Every structure is written in structure tokens, then in C-alpha cells.
Amino acid sequence: MKKLVFDYEMKLSFSAPVTDHRFQLRCIPATGPRQQVIDVEVKIQPETELETTIDSFGSVVMTGFIPEPHDIFSYSVTGIAFVDNAHIHKEAYKPLYRFNSALTIPGPNVEAMIDVCRERLAALPSDAIPVQQAAEVMDEVYKAFVYTPGSTTIRTTAEQALAQRKGVCQDYAHVMLSVCRHVGLTARYIAGLLGGEGATHAWVEVYQDGRWVGLDPTHNRLVDDSYITIAHGRDYRDCMLDIGIFSGYNVQQTQWVNASVHEQVA
């Protein structure tokens, strides 16, 4: 088990004042099967009332409305997470994670990787467990990509990312999800925090014996106690940390993000 202190900040600057700003945030790590979260503090500017709910995937969602003109919107989340991957609690099985979503539908490039991964899985012992199988897929995804910030967008599909052989963590995760689901593994997308990334991170969890076990295709390794979960879903769209709409004329926006995670040793 690790005691991790986390701090996540996001600042959105507008080129002109905006009004009637409605937003939805999924930025709070919550206590779950592999982590206990305490001392969470959320700050939002401009200040406004927040409504907190839990979405259908179990992620914490905050919604708010800022009617007054403003040219900056920012929030920060701080807290402490006790993460223990050695004692992950069981969760109910959800069949929807067996099927691909809009961002993970395969095309020719992903289908070719599926064929390669099927050959790798066939070479495993007959009693290979899901995590062992997923590790083979993860390795194939890792080798296929060059990590290239700015090469994709939030709308890039698994097929599009793999076609250009470059992307970021969400692209690695989307391709791995697509392949896993086609070879019979139940898998879901995770958005969270990892020390040293400077921003949010994405990885994959595979369902095994009633528990979700994490694998990080960007780094080609199993998820350990250094990872903090924020949200999970079928793909990135279910885990977007911030979504909003506002009124304004010809407004441009610039986003700044910073995330830090460090272990606190007693």
C-alpha cells in the first residue's frame, strides 16, 4: 500500500468574456476497490454552487452554472489516496465492457493487430489467466506506437491512431481495449493520475475472477500502487474530466493543466 498526495489543476482562459457557462467535472478520485481517498478539497473560480452525483459507471460528477461574465475558469482538486493493488475488492461483472464503443471500433489496422495477438495468445499455456493474455496484447500495442504529444485529439479513434502509429496514453488505451474485447477479454478505460506525468493518465483494466486488474500500455507494465483512479468507462468519452458549454462571440480558449502525485512516507 502507498499513501499518495495528489494535486490536479486546470485553468481555461477565454479570449473574451463568456456567460451562461454550464460545466460538468469528473475530477475527483473516489474511494473504490483499490483505493481509499480522504481529505479531498475542491476549489473553483469563479466561485459557484456545485451539485455532486455519481454517474452510471460509479464516477463522481460535479455540475455547476456560472451566469456572470468571466474570462477565466479554473478548478483544483487536492487530497490523499491510499492505494493497495494487493487487496483489490471484488466488483459485479458488467457485460457492456465486453463490447466496443465509438472510439474503439476496429478498422484494417486494428484488425491486423487482433490477428497478431490471437497468434500470441494461442502460444500461451491453456490455463493462462486473463491478465496474462492482456499482457500479451499490451506488449503488442506498446511496440506499435511512438508516444507523440499533439499527434491526436480527443476525437481520434483507435483505428486512426494505430494507422499513424503515434499517439498519447488515451490512444494506447483505446487500441488495447479494442483488441482485448475482440479476443474475448472484458476490459474498461481508466482515467487517473500517475506521478511524473504532469497531467492525467489513461490505462486499461481487465476483469479477472471478480476483480479489475490494471495494465498500462503506454509504459508496458502492470498498474501498481503509484496509480490513482479518477474515472472509468467504455472509452475516453465516458471519463472526460471537464465538459462545458457557454455563450460568447468568436471566443478562443486555451487550457493549462498540471497534475502532481507524490508518495508520503510515514
Predicted regions and their residues:
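Intrinsically disordered, low-complexity N-terminal segments that are enriched in acidic
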Residues: 1-84
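Short, surface-exposed linear segments at secondary-structure transitions and domain or protein termini
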Residues: 46-52, 97-103, 222-229
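Glycine-rich, small/acidic residue-mixed loop/short-helix segments
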Residues: 25-42, 220-239, 243, 247-250, ...
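Short acidic (Asp/Glu) patches
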Residues: 55-64, 91, 95-101
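Short, charged/polar, Gly/Pro-enriched secondary-structure boundary elements
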Residues: 84-85, 213
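Secondary-structure boundary elements
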Residues: 85, 95-167, 175, 236, ...
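Hydrophobic/aromatic-rich core segments of domains that either
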Residues: 171-246
